A protein has these predicted regions:
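Histidine/acidic-residue-rich, glycine-tolerant segments that coordinate divalent metal ions
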Residues: 67, 99-101, 122-124, 130-147, ...
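Sec/Tat-exported extracytoplasmic proteins
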Residues: 22, 29, 50, 198, ...
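Short Gly/Pro-enriched turn/cap motifs at secondary-structure boundaries
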Residues: 90-94, 185, 225-229, 372-376
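Metal-dependent amide/peptide-bond hydrolase catalytic core
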Residues: 258-436
């Protein structure tokens, strides 16, 4: 039996275990920076397999994290994670939202290959009707308001499957494997903190993936790459003014409503960029306490996007100038908190070709006709990919194809779990091709 056949056989034999692990992660869904139970279990399993394991502040640079919840909420989640069966040795490292995990396998001289598996859930209420398979079969989320509605329970499980297979063939590998289990992908808040801690420095190959829906009759199991992911920046903006009686002494006040209104109108008037697509959106505004009170505080949530990192930077700089100027114009002040960010991405041609060749010729898995899939949203794996490519390395973000129930980010989302062993085969086959 050659190594590719070993990879396929082992992946298929662990299908039941992969399904069980995915369902466990699904049942105990934890969103970004709350993945304390999830991370502790991943760290335990990697340790038992024999990996060198990094946790806590070894993984994420604390000050580079974005959109981190309050200390009070983090402590509440920590207590829940412990109560729900978090590993007692490793959960302590997740305190304060330090929920990344990296497993390292050193196999002598050779290239360094990193793989990213995101692990966070979403703030979604999962469907309880028996028509929803997780509800029917007893693994829907017990954490009300949190749900794996984007497949990251599957991604984390795939990473653990990859870890097991690669450890079993380590004698055939030359180089270093890094398995990066990333928190807080939703809201593009987590990847930069891992890059800023140096974990992509010196990496020669970077591979990420996402489960993606396919047509019912499509036999393909993978699209080798992605392009078109929009660079993005997200801010929470707080305007501060001065309250006053709206009828008796309005001139005494400093009305944040005027500052917010001026900012919104001018944000949507930012000139478009000739270099490509740009986006701006004001998603929420919360302000005011009564009809006869000059509002003294307002919160606004905004985002800008660009087809390239440069266009996004143009949009961001324009937006910051507008917001600060609108506040000043009406005698108010403002503070802006960065809540998430991502760069644009494009998969390396050579690595996409390698994925296609390995799948078709060695693993005998059908590949989609298109080499690369357009990603209309934003993905912070871009920070990792760009860092590797800037160093002269190769990176790709694959689409691992499956049949999905319900649209992504919906309360009825689910995946066909056959995608789990399929993805393990693809990752391990490509890594072996690079490192043997």
């Amino acid at each position: 039996m050659n190594i590719y056949d070993r990879i396929k056989t082992m992946s298929d034999e662990m299908a039941g275990d992969l399904t069980a692990q995915r369902r466990d992660f699904h049942k105990y869904a934890e969103p970004g920076w709350f993945e304390m139970r999830t991370s502790s279990i991943i760290a335990r399993k990697l340790t038992e397999l024999g990996y060198e394991v990094l946790v806590g502040d070894q993984v994420c640079k604390k000050d580079s994290r974005m959109g981190v919840p309050s200390e009070e909420k983090l402590e509440e989640q920590y207590e829940r994670a412990v109560a729900q069966g978090a590993d007692p040795e490793f959960v302590k490292y997740t305190k304060g939202g330090m929920t990344g995990v990296i497993g390292i396998l050193r196999c002598g001289e050779g290239p360094t290959v990193a793989m990213r598996f995101d692990i966070d859930a979403l703030g979604v209420f999962e469907e309880h009707d028996p028509s929803h398979r997780p509800a029917k079969e007893g693994f829907n989320s017990v954490n009300e308001g949190f749900m794996h509605a984007c497949g990251h329970d599957g991604h984390a499980t795939i990473g653990l499957g990859v870890a097991k297979v690669l450890m079993s063939i380590k004698d055939q590998l030359h180089g270093t494997v890094k398995l990066i289990f990333q928190p807080a992908e939703e809201g593009v808040r987590g990847a930069k903190s891992i890059v800023d801690n140096g974990h992509l420095d010196g990496v020669d190959y970077m591979i990420g993936s996402h489960v993606t829906n396919k047509k019912e009759d499509d036999p393909a199991v993978v699209i080798p790459g992605s392009y078109g992911s929009l660079a993005m920046t997200k801010y929470d903006v707080i305007f501060h003014g001065k309250s006053a009686h709206a009828g008796g002494s309005p001139e005494v006040g400093r009305n944040v409503m005027l500052a917010v209104g001026t900012a919104i109108l001018n944000l949507y008037a930012i000139p478009r960029h000739s270099g490509g697509v740009s986006r701006v959106n004001v998603g929420t505004v919360v302000a005011g306490s009564g009809r006869n009170v000059i509002a003294d505080e307002a919160k606004m949530e905004i985002e800008v996007r660009g087809e390239t990192t440069e266009i996004n930077e143009y949009m961001k700089n324009y937006a910051v100038n507008i917001i600060e100027s609108a506040a000043k114009m009406h005698g108010c002040t403002c503070e802006m908190k960065l809540m998430g960010a991502a760069n644009s991405l494009a998969s390396s041609e050579a690595l996409m070709e390698r994925v296609k060749r390995v799948c078709e010729e060695d693993l005998h898995l059908p590949v989609a006709k298109e080499m690369s899939s357009k990603n209309g949203g934003s993905e912070d794996v871009s920070y990792m990919m760009n860092r590797v490519q800037e160093q002269g390395g190769q990176a790709t973000f694959m689409r691992v194809l499956t049949h999905e129930a319900g649209p992504g980010h919906s309360r009825i989302f689910d995946i066909d779990e056959q995608v789990l062993p399929n993805a393990v085969k693809i990752f391990c086959g490509v890594v072996y091709d690079i490192m043997h």
